[in-house]
Structure formats: C-alpha cells, structure tokens
Amino acid sequence: MADNDFDNVTEECFTSTKSFWNFPCAHRQYRHEGNCHLIHGYSRSFHFVFGIKSFTKEGFAVDYGDLKELKAHLDHMYDHTLVLDEEDPHIDTFRKLENAGVCRIRTHPMGPGMEGTAHYLCEWTDNWLRKKTRGRAWVISVEARENDKNSSIYTNPNAGFKGWTG
C-alpha cells in the first residue's frame, strides 16, 4: 500500500468481484451414502467478492493484476487434483496412489464439497488479501461452483475493516 492510500479512504460501500473458471479436479464425499462417496470430478469455478476501506492510488478497489498469487493457489489446489476430507478413512490408500504418481491429493478440513471449499478459500484469501493490502481490502464472500447447477456461498463473518496493518 502506498503512503497516499490513507488519503483514499472511503466511507461508501464499494465492492469488487473476481471470478476464476475451469479448474478440473475430482473429489469424494466419504460420508455420503449415495454416489457422491465415489470419486467424481467437475470443472470448478470461484467467485470472490471483496470489500475495501480505501482505493489504491490508481483508484482501484482491488487491482486484478495483483491477484496472481491467488490464481497460483487455485491452480495448486484445484488443477488436476483430488480433493479429500482430511478425515477420509482411506486417506492412506490415496496417499499411496499419490506417491506412485497417480494423483495429487489436497485436503480440506471442512470436506471437499463446495461448502468446505468456499469456507477454505474465504479464510485463505481473506488472510492473504489483508496482509497484501495492509488491511485495506478483505473478502466478503466466496462462491464455489462445481457445475452450472450447483454452488455454495460462504459469507465471511469477519468481513470489514479491522485496522491498518504492517
């Protein structure tokens, strides 16, 4: 954040959004009694809503060019990966497959579905964005979409200005 960002403080409620599309990955819901306990895949997409306390010196709420690290994290987590619940009873079997080069495992503490994914991404991105902007910007919500019909939105209970940092 530039020194003059403190001069760009706004009392208005501005938000900014960014969407990322087409992350091919698989997951399984081991607790599900139906077909979702089987490994299946989707092309995931994500929609982020950001809030701000001030604009950048260029007048942006969030400079989309500064989101490369977020995109890299999404690639790491969801590009040709297998997302599992960290408590999946077969995690050791999946780790053996990963060690054999058959898959790349990623885990979520709240499960691999869209609800757990939206929650995970909201927390990760909010922490990252607040550090990157010295508290100027934060995440309001994240939508995780598994296809055209199904998504989950997690609304950040900690959204809002918490003070300038770093």
Each language-model region and where it sits:
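Charge-rich, low-complexity N-terminal segments
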Residues: A2-G166
